[in-house]
């Protein structure tokens, strides 16, 4: 059975399918973690420790030595992505505060869901698209953009938006595993390769644990909102990133390729809620919305990027 290949055919499948399975188990057997305890209980409830390891491994893949082009390209896209998250967070906070919409067609929508969806780029998708329509330096620009990974900038954005702030210790704690990984990976290339191989392996495990804290009813309610948020991510961040790419000498393809939601962004609401319990009531719905945005952006971004590349006459590097 080609289970892995089947999962990979679904956009964000390594994140989304285990997330759904965890949610299904929690919906049908809500006391499973307590009933089985031991390692089974840890697998169902241990998403945060797995995420800590994930961010150490992710940090190890970030190279301090970047060429000026990589710094310029990656830095411009990274800063633009974060600024858009801040702007959306500030505007959203005026209407939603720390809570979420509890009825109507936008039920479950919160500032946390919006910011988490917009702050983090799907690195695998970006690098695959730039491998097709860009040059190797464009692919390498993700080494700078990957600094956006994790909950740190979402926490900062929520604080800037005037919502419940986080103690400095929590902010440091949110980014410390990434920094430790960066230091280790740059001190030893073999460690970088060793830890780097674990990044994709850990994704389905923390996704399953996150799903085990959710209910299918929450996912169902978040369906339409998640689709709308995904479209908003492509339109809003895509427009800003396209402009930033053009202003830094690009043709716009890199900007469009970065207008997505990372699979691991679905983990951010739970981490934020663990750091500040004011966000605990909105975290399950936010997780479902972000997961939906992962799928929607994974479908739309390649189509839009390929369309623009064709329009400006850029040849697919993978074409025969």
Swiss-Prot record:
Transmembrane regions: 10-30, 42-62, 76-96, 98-118, 143-163, 165-185, 199-219, 224-244, 253-273, 288-308
Membrane disposition: Multi-pass membrane protein
GO cellular component: plasma membrane
Catalytic activity: 2-dehydro-3-deoxy-D-gluconate(in) + H(+)(in) = 2-dehydro-3-deoxy-D-gluconate(out) + H(+)(out)
Subcellular location: Cell membrane
Similarity annotation: Belongs to the KdgT transporter family.
Function: Catalyzes the proton-dependent uptake of 2-keto-3-deoxygluconate (KDG) into the cell.
Name this polypeptide is given: 2-keto-3-deoxygluconate permease
Organism: Carboxydothermus hydrogenoformans (strain ATCC BAA-161 / DSM 6008 / Z-2901)
Gene designation per UniProt: kdgT
């Amino acid at each position: 059975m080609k289970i892995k290949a089947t999962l990979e055919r679904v956009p964000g499948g390594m994140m989304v399918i285990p997330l759904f399975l965890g949610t299904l188990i929690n919906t049908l057997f809500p006391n499973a973690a307590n009933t089985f305890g031991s390692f089974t209980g840890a697998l169902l409830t241990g998403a945060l420790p797995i995420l800590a390891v994930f961010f150490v491994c992710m940090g190890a893949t970030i190279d301090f030595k970047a060429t000026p082009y990589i710094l310029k390209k990656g830095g411009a896209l990274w800063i633009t992505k974060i600024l858009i998250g801040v702007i959306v967070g500030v505007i959203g906070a005026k209407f939603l505060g720390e809570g979420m919409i509890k009825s109507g067609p936008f039920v479950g929508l919160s500032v946390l869901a919006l910011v988490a969806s917009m702050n983090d780029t799907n690195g695998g998708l970006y690098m695959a698209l730039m491998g097709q329509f860009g040059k190797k330096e464009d692919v390498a620009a993700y080494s700078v953009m990957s600094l956006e990974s994790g909950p740190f900038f979402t926490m900062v954005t929520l604080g800037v938006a005037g919502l419940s702030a986080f103690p400095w210790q929590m902010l440091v704690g949110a980014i410390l595993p990434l920094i430790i990984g960066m230091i280790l990976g740059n001190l030893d290339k073999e460690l970088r390769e060793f830890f780097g191989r674990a990044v994709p392996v850990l994704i389905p495990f923390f996704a399953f644990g996150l799903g085990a804290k959710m209910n299918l009813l929450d996912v169902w309610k978040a369906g339409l909102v998640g689709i709308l948020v995904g479209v908003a991510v492509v339109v809003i961040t895509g427009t800003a990133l396209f402009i930033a790419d053009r202003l830094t000498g690009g043709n716009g393809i890199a900007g469009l390729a970065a207008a997505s939601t990372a699979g691991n962004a679905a983990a951010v609401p739970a981490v934020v809620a663990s750091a500040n319990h004011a966000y605990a009531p909105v975290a399950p719905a936010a997780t479902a919305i972000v997961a939906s945005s992962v799928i929607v952006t994974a479908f739309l971004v390649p189509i839009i990027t390929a369309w623009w590349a064709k329009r400006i006459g850029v040849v697919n590097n993978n074409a025969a």
